[in-house]
């Protein structure tokens, strides 16, 4: 899906790592929440509350998921899942565009 309709966009940006990772939150009529963001090159670690589906819309990133000791490359068109209440690491070598979906379990 290349666009979302009938959503509320939160004006204030989510800014992480001194502005190297930014996103905007959108909320659907049913309460579902997603963020649309950009990551500049760098090494990052994020923690999750909810389960997350990370869809790569542009660029690529190397991802180390919980329970793994190696990085796997995800590129445009790929999606990876991150368990709730966990941490994952990223190595971004080029600007990456992403959509993160938060999944209530």
UniProtKB/Swiss-Prot annotation:
Catalyzed reactions per annotation: a purine D-ribonucleoside + phosphate = a purine nucleobase + alpha-D-ribose 1-phosphate; adenosine + phosphate = alpha-D-ribose 1-phosphate + adenine; cytidine + phosphate = cytosine + alpha-D-ribose 1-phosphate; guanosine + phosphate = alpha-D-ribose 1-phosphate + guanine
This entry's Enzyme Commission designation comes to 2.4.2.1, 2.4.2.2
What is the recorded name of this protein?
Pyrimidine/purine nucleoside phosphorylase
The terms describing its cellular component in GO are: cytosol
Can you tell me which family this protein belongs to? Belongs to the nucleoside phosphorylase PpnP family.
Gene Ontology molecular functions:
guanosine phosphorylase activity; purine-nucleoside phosphorylase activity; thymidine phosphorylase activity; uridine phosphorylase activity
Query: What this chain does, per the record?
Result: Catalyzes the phosphorolysis of diverse nucleosides, yielding D-ribose 1-phosphate and the respective free bases. Can use uridine, adenosine, guanosine, cytidine, thymidine, inosine and xanthosine as substrates. Also catalyzes the reverse reactions.
Protein's organism: Clostridium beijerinckii (strain ATCC 51743 / NCIMB 8052)
Which gene name does the record give? Answer: ppnP
The record, for Pfam families, names: Ppnp
UniProt lineage: Bacteria, Bacillati, Bacillota, Clostridia, Eubacteriales
Name the UniProt key words of this record, in alphabetical order: Glycosyltransferase, Transferase
Q: What class of enzyme is it?
A: transferase
Name the InterPro entries for this protein.
Ppnp, RmlC-like_jellyroll, RmlC_Cupin_sf
């Amino acid at each position: 899906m290349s666009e979302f309709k009938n959503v509320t966009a939160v004006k204030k940006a989510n800014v992480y790592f001194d502005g190297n990772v930014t996103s905007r939150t959108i909320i659907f009529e049913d309460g579902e929440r997603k963020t649309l963001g950009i990551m500049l090159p760098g090494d990052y670690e994020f923690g999750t509350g909810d389960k997350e589906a990370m869809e790569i819309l542009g660029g690529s990133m190397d991802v180390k998921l919980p329970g793994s000791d190696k990085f796997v490359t995800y590129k445009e068109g790929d999606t990876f899942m991150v368990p709730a209440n966990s941490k994952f690491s990223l190595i971004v070598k080029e600007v990456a565009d992403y959509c993160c979906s938060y999944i209530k379990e």
